[in-house]
């Protein structure tokens, strides 16, 4: 639970955060350049807005907004959002999070969205450890990868998820982001 002190600490911390962190999109409307994936009428946008997201693998080059989209999902959902990095995560970490998710679901009916950044870096056994939880909807998996998931992610996970491809930003998109960073109070406009 946030208190007056944690709000103050968060405000102070955000003052020294890197520009990219301060400018990270907070809503789907702030996410730039991915209208095909999250534009008006897309299934993903509808699922996020209705808080009815099912497992999804976000696939695209670095810098396309995969992690930002996951953070927008975190802000938009009533579910508990848990983030795991495939670089340092272990099978025991995953099992602990899945056990906690199952308890939350059983005790309070609260769903868990498990965000696995760089899911392609998990080995086969680590990916297999997610299968039961995804299959039984103990967690809603949101995986992010720069690699083609059809080659790098367990086919059983792929078959239980939707794959959404994010595309590189256009020059116009990058220009819009730079202007926003210069003018927005969270960016350089607030300095």
Language-model segments: which ranges?
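Conserved catalytic/switch belt of AAA+ P-loop NTPases
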Residues: 45-49, 116, 120-159
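Conserved AAA+ ATPase "SRH/arginine-finger" region at the nucleotide-binding site
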Residues: 85-87, 162-175
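Walker A/P-loop
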Residues: 2-12, 46-84, 99-102, 131-136
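Short glycine-rich substrate-engagement loop in P-loop NTPases that contacts/grips substrate
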Residues: 37-42, 79-113, 124
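Conserved beta-strand position immediately N-terminal to the Walker
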Residues: 29, 56, 164
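Conserved small helical "lid"/interfacial subdomain of P-loop NTPases
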Residues: 170-191
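A short, basic N-terminal segment
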Residues: 1-50
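A short hydrophobic beta-strand->loop->alpha-helix junction that borders the nucleotide-binding pocket
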Residues: 60-61, 82-90, 145-146, 166
């Amino acid at each position: 639970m946030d208190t007056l002190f944690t709000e103050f600490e968060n405000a102070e911390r955000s003052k020294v955060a890197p520009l990219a962190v301060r400018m990270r999109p907070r809503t789907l409307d702030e996410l730039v350049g991915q209208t095909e994936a999250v534009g008006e009428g897309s299934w993903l946008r509808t699922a996020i807005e209705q808080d009815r997201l099912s497992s999804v693998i976000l696939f695209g080059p670095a810098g396309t907004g995969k992690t930002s989209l996951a953070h927008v999902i975190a802000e938009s959902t009533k579910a508990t959002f848990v983030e795991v990095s495939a670089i340092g995560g272990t099978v025991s970490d995953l099992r602990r999070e899945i056990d906690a998710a199952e308890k939350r679901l059983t005790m309070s009916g609260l769903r868990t969205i498990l965000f696995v950044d760089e899911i392609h870096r998990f080995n086969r056994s680590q990916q297999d450890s997610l299968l039961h939880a995804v299959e039984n909807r103990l967690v809603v998996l949101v995986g992010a990868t720069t690699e083609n998931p059809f080659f790098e992610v367990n086919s059983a996970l792929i078959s239980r998820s939707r794959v959404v491809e994010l595309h590189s930003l256009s020059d116009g998109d990058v220009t819009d982001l730079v202007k926003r960073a210069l003018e927005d109070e969270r960016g350089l406009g607030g300095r």
